[in-house]
Swiss-Prot record:
Monomeric. It is an enzyme of class 1 (oxidoreductase). The gene is MB. Monomeric heme protein which primary function is to store oxygen and facilitate its diffusion within muscle tissues. Reversibly binds oxygen through a pentacoordinated heme iron and enables its timely and efficient release as needed during periods of heightened demand. Depending on the oxidative conditions of tissues and cells, and in addition to its ability to bind oxygen, it also has a nitrite reductase activity whereby it regulates the production of bioactive nitric oxide. Its EC number is 1.7.-.-, 1.11.1.-. This is Myoglobin. It catalyses: Fe(III)-heme b-[protein] + nitric oxide + H2O = Fe(II)-heme b-[protein] + nitrite + 2 H(+); H2O2 + AH2 = A + 2 H2O. GO terms for cellular component: extracellular exosome; sarcoplasm. The modification Phosphothreonine is found at T68. The lineage of its organism: Eukaryota, Metazoa, Chordata, Craniata, Vertebrata. Pfam families: Globin.
Amino acid sequence: MGLSDGEWELVLKTWGKVEADIPGHGEFVLVRLFTGHPETLEKFDKFKHLKTEGEMKASEDLKKQGVTVLTALGGILKKKGHHEAEIQPLAQSHATKHKIPIKYLEFISDAIIHVLQSKHPAEFGADAQAAMKKALELFRNDIAAKYKELGFQG
């Protein structure tokens, strides 16, 4: 299910827009995730108390987490599918420490797509959306395979 060179080019061109404002994109992605899927908040001790979008946007911890998430994802995307070294520790921590279900990775992938559509409609057309969805699915599938190796039924 790999991506073509052209698809990776679209993914990385779009990701360049994210990198121009990682804090802003990260906050938007997490707020979208938590408002769309409030159950995901339970996996974050620092955010469990945040109930409204305003509270979420005011949280410095949430902003920092958004930067952490998108910085890690950017590093993985730049590997163009050759991300074994990056995926292993991420899967390990998400399976054994954080216990993050794969479904939640689907939710955040959807939030990322939504944010990119909202913030960059001209640059994030159908081809770029399809390529990004494919790249995020590859990431999730590889995390899921590692989860299975670790015996985590996430």
